[in-house]
């Protein structure tokens, strides 16, 4: 790869552990140790890459915060219009909200993902964002 991707926080390694929940290639660069503090990681998506619909469950607190640091991407909550994301945008995702996020078709995209502490937190991975939906953005 000749171009630098991942913004100031670096590309990281191929996100192989979660590849089955993504269309396209993504990369993960952990920024904190979740044993010591809240978990934060820089997640980078190649053009056209997006994760499946998913839900960050919690009985209290929880959810996720995305801080956009490089490129352009998309965020969408189930049943709502998609939101185009740019460097500097921040997305606060409440617990128990079905959503997806990823790169635009023609841009790499990186965001810092912050796991918001909560009680009884789990992640539920759902269906992929189909090509027809994505290509019509």
Regions picked out by a protein language model, each given a short descriptive name:
Residues 1-39, 122-137:
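A short, N-terminal "cap"/entry segment at the start of jelly-roll beta-barrel domains
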Residues 28-30, 40-44, 65, 82, ...:
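Conserved hydrophobic/aromatic beta-strand scaffold that supports enzyme active sites
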Residues 30-32, 52-58, 77, 83-84, ...:
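Short histidine-centered beta-strand/loop micro-motifs
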Residues 34, 46-48, 68, 78, ...:
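A short, compositionally biased micro-patch
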Residues 41-60:
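Conserved short histidine dyad/triad with adjacent acidic residue
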Residues 48, 85-106:
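Conserved metal-binding segment of the jelly-roll/cupin
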Residues 50, 60-87, 97:
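A short beta-strand-loop-beta hairpin characteristic of the jelly-roll/cupin
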Residues 92, 106-125:
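A short hydrophobic beta-strand segment most commonly corresponding to one strand
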């Amino acid at each position: 790869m000749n171009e630098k991707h991942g913004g100031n926080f670096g590309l990281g390694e191929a996100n192989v552990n979660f590849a089955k929940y993504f269309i396209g290639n993504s990369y993960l660069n952990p920024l904190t140790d979740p044993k010591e503090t809240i978990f934060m990681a820089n997640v980078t998506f190649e053009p056209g890459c997006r994760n499946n619909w998913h839900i960050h469950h919690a009985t209290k607190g929880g959810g996720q915060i995305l801080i956009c640091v490089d490129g352009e991407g998309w965020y969408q909550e189930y049943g709502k219009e998609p939101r185009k994301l740019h460097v500097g945008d921040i997305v606060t995702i409440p617990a128990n909200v079905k959503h997806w996020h990823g790169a635009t078709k023609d841009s790499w995209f990186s965001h810092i993902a912050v796991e918001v502490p909560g009680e009884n937190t789990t992640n539920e991975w759902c269906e992929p964002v189909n090509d027809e939906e994505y290509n019509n953005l």
